[in-house]
Amino acid sequence: MLDTLLINIGQLLTMDQEDGLLRREAMNTLPVIENGAVGIENGVITFVGTAEEAKGLQAKEVIDCGGKMVSPGLVDPHTHLVFGGSRENEIALKLQGVPYLEILEQGGGILSTVNATKQASKEELVQKAKFHLDRMLSFGVTTVEAKSGYGLDDETEWKQLEATAQLQKEHPIDLVSTFLGAHAVPKEYKGRSKEFLQWMLDLLPEMKEKQLAEFVDIFCETGVFSVEESKEFLLKAKELGFDVKIHADEIDPLGGAEAAAEIGAASADHLVGASDKGIEMLANSNTVATLLPGTTFYLNKESFARGRKMIDEGVAVALATDFNPGSCPTENIQLIMSIAMLKLKMTPEEVWNAVTVNSSYAINRGEVAGKIRVGRKADLVLWDAYNYAYVPYHYGVSHVNTVWKNGNIAYTRGEQSWSTATI
């Protein structure tokens, strides 16, 4: 007997069309079962089909979804989850048009967050991050990548990674940990970036032994780390058994996209300034282009990543919030979906695939997350919407009704608009 059976699902978005990364037309295709049903047992999906096919199934609880839509839990593959403080004091500078790199030089930007994170205890960081994770869950996210990078020293970086490990045990959302010690060059290492990177590399063996990080990332940008420094650093991390990511071409077109494809990074993120050659190389690689339009929006910039061109040329595109205290302080992945549709010229179908299938592959979770398939975790979202286009169309609010994580209700609105029923 099933534990739970969901019936009367108006649109069941399985996202289950083909294995591997989705590109071109596959990104613009959504497998939808009309009047669908999903069966759950021991936290695992055991039935996917139509309500007609589900007749005769026995379940301890049968939930009538009222003709509303059900999707997989969403995947946010790029966040800076664990940090201290906030940076609302920088809003005025941004409105005046002060460039981020200038704010950084004044001791603001990431350096401000670094100081607040250093001063916070691990438990304070955990409790703050739980608050943000709860919000992410309420927006339909069930898997999140979490970066360190607000320490720029060994003690604080360890503290961030240990906080993430504790959160993995204490919060329903699945977390994927990334070490971003190479997020900026500390003042004491100004002009000595190679020495700083070697210091970060020296931390990796113990980090690997303690399994505190799965990925290693670096901020490849003017005034921070060069393309050559980034490639050398990430290749050494790969030799130690880590998968790698790269903050690439966010501000200047340095060649970060090309570097990511060349070294086989799991993802290249931002890519606002990615060159035509970089896009071509990404299209011919298995590196996911994780686009972060919420950051461009919040920084009030006119030029967004060329998402339309990337998809048309065969790049596997994912979307993420880039949740962080400075350049994108939002946990709302649904808002990111809307911005991507409007500013990156992505279709609703492409947007949905970019926050499920491709985003899961960007963090090596393509075989366990992002799809509704028999044998996978029952990470499901019931939406207060009757079709998938409505979610990115009606922007600025959350359309989530209920979230199941491993078959258990992890979030629901104050009142449930569905009721239990029998077949």
From Swiss-Prot:
GO biological process: L-histidine catabolic process to glutamate and formamide; L-histidine catabolic process to glutamate and formate
Subcellular location: Cytoplasm
GO function terms (MF aspect): imidazolonepropionase activity; iron ion binding; zinc ion binding
Phylogenetic lineage: Bacteria, Bacillati, Bacillota, Bacilli, Bacillales
Annotated binding of Fe(3+), by residue: 78, 80, 247, 322
Function: Catalyzes the hydrolytic cleavage of the carbon-nitrogen bond in imidazolone-5-propanoate to yield N-formimidoyl-L-glutamate. It is the third step in the universal histidine degradation pathway.
Alphabetical keyword list: Cytoplasm, Histidine metabolism, Hydrolase, Iron, Metal-binding, Zinc
Pathway note: Amino-acid degradation; L-histidine degradation into L-glutamate; N-formimidoyl-L-glutamate from L-histidine: step 3/3
Protein name: Imidazolonepropionase
Cofactor note: Binds 1 zinc or iron ion per subunit.
Residues that bind Zn(2+): 78, 80, 247, 322
EC annotation from Swiss-Prot or TrEMBL: 3.5.2.7
Reactions catalysed according to its record: 4-imidazolone-5-propanoate + H2O = N-formimidoyl-L-glutamate
Pfam name, any one: Amidohydro_1
Annotated residues for binding of 4-imidazolone-5-propanoate: 87, 150, 183, 250, 327
Protein's organism: Bacillus thuringiensis (strain Al Hakam)
Source organism, top-level taxon: Bacteria
